[in-house]
Amino acid sequence: MIYQIKFSEEALKDIERLKESGNKSVLKKLAKLFLELQEHPYTGTMQVEQLKHYEVQTLSRRINREHRLVYRIQEQFVTVLVLSAFGYY
């Protein structure tokens, strides 16, 4: 099953900030993460961490030491909603 990826306003701003940083390794890793999320959002080559203190299941994957990709899976719509991609939670 292929999941559709959607982005929150904050995630779009975060991705733009990462692009402006010019860090090619971060952008390459981010692109790889998006491909993995489409195929298997619950597992992957990077460690998937379930975040606490959220009412809805919210997951995170490491982009690099500084940044995390935070997302939710909407099974009823076969969608992954990316919440943020800049900073550490």
Model features per residue range: what roles?
Residues 35-62:
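A short, surface-exposed loop/turn module that caps and links secondary-structure elements
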